[in-house]
Amino acid sequence: MKEKINTLLKHAEDIWRKLCKNEIQAKIEKYEKEINQKNFWNDPKRAQKVIKAQSILKNKIDPWEELINKIKDLSDLCEIAENEKDTNGLEIEFNTLEKQYKDLLTISYFKEELDANNAFLTIHSGAGGTEACDWVAMLYRMYSRYAERKKYKTELIDLLEAEGGIKSVTIEIKGEYAYGLLKSEVGIHRLIRISPFDAAKKRHTSFASVFVDPVIDDKIEITIKPEDIRIDTYRASGAGGQHVNKTSSAVRITHIETGIVTQSQSDRSQHKNKDLAMKVLKSRLYEYYKSKEDEKNKSKQDTKKEISWGNQIRSYVFQPYNLVKDHRTKFENSNTTSVMDGNIDNFIEEYLKWKSLN
């Protein structure tokens, strides 16, 4: 046990030193000097932005210092326990600290300004007809369960039902680092299974696309003029055209220049649906223009490959064997039931590691 504790301590101290040696500590000190200036609050919007930026950076270092102190305390307890030949309970405490270490390691991979923000997650059905719509419903449940496991909150923004499942769905996932974690899910997801909709019990392949955008807070200004958009209202409807209500409460917003379309029909209030659709539009415009400016990264518009065979980032195979495999990181898990119940943390962690090296 002593050796395991010392190894964990060494790893934690190595990460802490790397974080302090890079520009993080210098930026924290720079923000601290700015905050202490007499005229700091003359520009409240700028002041709030600085405080949030400093808080995000501190949250990358302070928890490591706390963890290191806890591991050192456990190391001292281990020596006492071994001398008294009573090590009961040390394993439980070690496992708790090891999990904290893994969680903090994941957070250390986040580099982008909005990684700590909430996220909009959208799933669209691809090739596969009814089977593909059922696949969207399965993924919707998977991400909802993931959010539940993380103690994140979710809000339904838009849902278009279809025979056998869901044609498309957009949800907001609210929680710290929701965007930073879930952007690993962007891409084509492939399902291979014996279709419950096929009387001949043949094997079918279906596709769905997942897109993730950061929720833009008030500290980032995205200006949208009335003449830049077209707003359409329509009746919210369910599968087969069944009306959820008889008023035109659903809202669709089209950004004319980019062609980006957002919509919401989750609320009975047209005003609320308009606000939600506008909120999603701001997030997608931020990502659109950001990717346009960044020549090193491909625009999301360029990465929207055809939702079909050969472009998938991850495959979920239920027949003839059980396996979920990420084609980017090569990480795989044969427990498909667990994965579909939202246990995708390992896939996300492996992606973040892979992304940091590529």
UniProtKB/Swiss-Prot annotation:
Function noted in UniProt: Peptide chain release factor 2 directs the termination of translation in response to the peptide chain termination codons UGA and UAA.
Similarity comment: family membership: Belongs to the prokaryotic/mitochondrial release factor family.
Keywords assigned by UniProt, alphabetized: Cytoplasm, Methylation, Protein biosynthesis
GO BP terms in the entry: viral translational frameshifting
Pfam families reported for this sequence: PCRF, RF-1
Additional note from the record: The gene for this protein contains a UGA in-frame termination codon after Leu-19; a naturally occurring frameshift enables complete translation of RF-2. This provides a mechanism for the protein to regulate its own production.
Signal peptide: none
Alphabetical list of NCBIfam families matching this protein: prfB
GO molecular function, one term: translation release factor activity, codon specific
Gene Ontology CC annotations of this record: cytoplasm
Modified residues annotated as N5-methylglutamine in this record: Q242
Cell location: Cytoplasm
Domain of life per record: Bacteria
Primary location class: cytoplasm
Entry protein name: Peptide chain release factor 2
Post-translation changes: Methylated by PrmC. Methylation increases the termination efficiency of RF2.
